[in-house]
């Protein structure tokens, strides 16, 4: 739809115009809208602001920042305001409320109010005829939208063509007050989405973030764009091979030109590749990737090998080398000694540990790993799981909920389990990548071990019982009288229970022979308070082992089969539970 007016003279009492009398000639506005230029849009903006009784500065502040002018400044700037009791700041604030625009328009166009400012009536009538927007409150709403759109055009002149197309195609913007009964934001959202080619754009145009610090922390949740300046420029091997295809054998190109058979210029290419990587790696913000790659390659190679020979980097306090290997040390570009880092990493992996293997010296080590619906052996909470850092050797799940129903996986933290620095060791999770890190050293090498494992070929067909220490100095236990605190699985008469139990003040010697007999401190509180069923012969107990429910030999778990081979029939089969020698009594069954 095109706006229409060509040297028009307005007069008369149009319907809904309340008989305001003859209007001044507005023929100076040349508005055959195909011929609208900058002067025509400026005249339209002046007419719209005159109808709204607002200045350009006030309207621009409202459109750009969404804030009305101060009440005092508005009253001073418009001495002949349409409403003597309310300033423009009041009505611009009223527009933000649901239905505020319609209330403002109706009050502005009421006959009793227009008599206070008779110069506004002709401006509104002129703009109504220009835009075809009707009279009364509807014309006032169209004047508000036209002024809003033209202010956006003056603020963003680069989008003037799209804004002009919107004004020409969509005028009048509302044909009745019901279209804007809920407010002006719906139409303005569609206008801004069309102009800026966005799926959604809420007014105002600019917004100030009231929490800039929190927004900086949330930047990691967004995927940043590729920065060409941060890319490492390296020679392309494929282009080099194509350019030297006539000089190389096809098999050498296929095998990526091994150094043994490569021509002399291959070494030049390798040198150029290394030089370009070193040039870019020296000032990379994330560190030196070349040194880190060498470090990971050397550490992984030594850890996977059965034996490795490491130079001892003996360095004095002054930084001068006083001993160690005969050859030169591996030093990265601008970085510290690489051999020292590799030495520390490998030695810490092989020395620092928080786990002890308790010898399976007695029947209490042979647990039943029978799985049923109420207690899946392969579940996340049974047997208890120890999460530890493979670099610093600390246990990371003291008092932490790990997995579904993680009460059996978390060890209650006590003062004994915060050694030296009294710092709680736990796992940090990256919300961007999902990787876990050690809170003590920042390593991503996190391992898991069950405190109880069934017999297998890997363990020499012997069960494994592990104890978790509060520190990472398991190799420091050099004598049998050394006192320590540890967490072990339950070693009570119930062979199916493996809940974690805290042992305090136990010696190394007592820990070595802990599986020979049942000790009260090695039994969990649930097993100590458990009552026997009334008749276990008719209905097997929920926590009965494979031998107690008399499963066929082929369906028994590895722990029960090995237990029967070594110790025969358990006492729970010979005596009913609850009686002397029974599996649920406080006495240990005969071995």
Swiss-Prot record:
Name any GO cellular component annotation. viral tegument
- Specify the superkingdom: Viruses
Q: Which Pfam families does its entry note?
A: Herpes_UL49_1
User: Where is the region Disordered?
Assistant: 571-591
What are the alphabetically sorted keywords of the record? Early protein
Q: Name one GO biological process term.
A: viral process
What function is annotated for this protein? Part of the viral pre-initiation complex (vPIC) that is responsible for the expression of vPIC-dependent late genes. vPIC is composed of at least BcRF1 that binds the viral TATT box, BDLF3.5, BDLF4, BFRF2, BGLF3, BGLF4 and BVLF1.
Cite the record's note on assembly.
Part of a trimeric complex composed of BGLF3, BFRF2 and BVLF1.
Instruction: Tell me the protein family, please.
Output: Belongs to the Epstein-Barr virus BFRF2 family.
Name used for this protein in its record: Late gene expression regulator BFRF2
What organism does the UniProt record list as the source?
A: Epstein-Barr virus (strain B95-8)
């Amino acid at each position: 739809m095109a706006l229409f007016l060509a040297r028009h003279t307005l007069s008369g009492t149009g319907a809904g115009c309340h008989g305001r009398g003859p209007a001044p000639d507005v023929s100076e506005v040349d508005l055959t809208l195909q011929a609208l230029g900058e002067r025509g849009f400026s005249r339209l903006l002046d007419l719209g602001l005159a109808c709204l009784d607002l200045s350009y500065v006030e309207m621009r502040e409202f459109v750009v920042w969404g804030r009305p002018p101060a009440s005092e400044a508005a009253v001073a700037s418009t001495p002949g305001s349409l409403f003597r009791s309310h300033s423009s700041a009041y009505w611009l604030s009223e527009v933000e409320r649901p239905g505020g625009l319609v209330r403002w328009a109706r009050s502005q166009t009421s006959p009793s109010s227009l008599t206070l400012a008779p110069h506004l009536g002709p401006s509104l009538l002129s703009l109504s005829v220009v835009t075809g927007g009707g009279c009364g409150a509807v014309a006032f709403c169209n004047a508000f939208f036209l002024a809003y759109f033209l202010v956006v055009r003056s603020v963003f002149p680069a989008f003037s063509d799209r804004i002009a197309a919107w004004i020409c195609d969509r005028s009048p913007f509302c044909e009745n007050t019901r279209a804007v009964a809920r407010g002006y934001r719906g139409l303005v959202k569609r206008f801004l989405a069309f102009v800026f080619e966005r799926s959604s754009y809420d007014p105002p145009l600019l917004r100030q973030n009231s929490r800039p610090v929190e927004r900086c922390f949330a930047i990691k949740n967004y995927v940043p764009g590729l920065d060409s300046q941060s890319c490492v420029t390296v020679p392309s091997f494929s282009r080099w091979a194509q350019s030297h295809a006539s000089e190389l054998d096809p098999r050498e190109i296929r095998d990526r030109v091994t150094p043994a058979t490569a021509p002399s210029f291959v070494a030049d290419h390798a040198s150029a590749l290394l030089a370009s990587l070193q040039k870019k790696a020296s000032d990379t913000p994330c560190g030196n990737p070349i040194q880190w790659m060498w470090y990971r390659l050397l550490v992984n190679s030594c850890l996977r090998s059965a034996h490795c020979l490491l130079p001892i980097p003996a360095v004095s306090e002054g930084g001068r080398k006083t001993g160690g290997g005969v050859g030169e040390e591996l030093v990265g570009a601008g970085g510290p000694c690489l051999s020292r880092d590799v030495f520390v990493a490998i030695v810490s992996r092989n020395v620092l540990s928080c786990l002890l293997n308790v010898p399976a010296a007695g029947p209490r080590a042979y647990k039943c790993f029978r799985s049923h619906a109420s207690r899946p052996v392969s579940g996340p909470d049974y047997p208890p799981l120890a999460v530890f850092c493979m670099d610093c050797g600390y246990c990371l799940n003291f008092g932490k909920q790990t997995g579904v129903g993680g009460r059996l996986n978390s060890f209650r933290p006590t003062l004994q389990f915060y050694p030296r620095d009294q710092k709680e060791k736990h796992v940090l999770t990256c919300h961007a990548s999902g990787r876990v890190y050690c809170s003590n050293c920042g390593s991503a090498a996190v391992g898991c071990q069950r405190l109880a494992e069934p017999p297998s070929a890997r363990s020499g067909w012997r069960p494994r019982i592990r104890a978790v220490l509060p520190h990472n100095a398991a190799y420091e236990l050099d004598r049998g009288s050394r006192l320590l605190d540890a967490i072990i699985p339950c070693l009570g008469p119930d062979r199916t229970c493996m809940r974690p139990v805290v042992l305090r003040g136990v010696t190394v010697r007592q820990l070595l022979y802990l599986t020979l007999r049942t000790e009260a401190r090695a039994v969990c509180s649930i097993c100590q308070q458990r009552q026997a069923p009334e008749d276990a012969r008719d209905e097997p107990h929920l926590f009965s082992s494979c031998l107690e429910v008399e499963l066929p030999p082929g369906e028994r778990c590895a722990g029960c089969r090995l237990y029967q081979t070594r110790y025969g029939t358990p006492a729970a089969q010979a005596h009913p539970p609850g009686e002397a020698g029974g599996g649920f009594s406080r006495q240990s069954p005969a071995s």
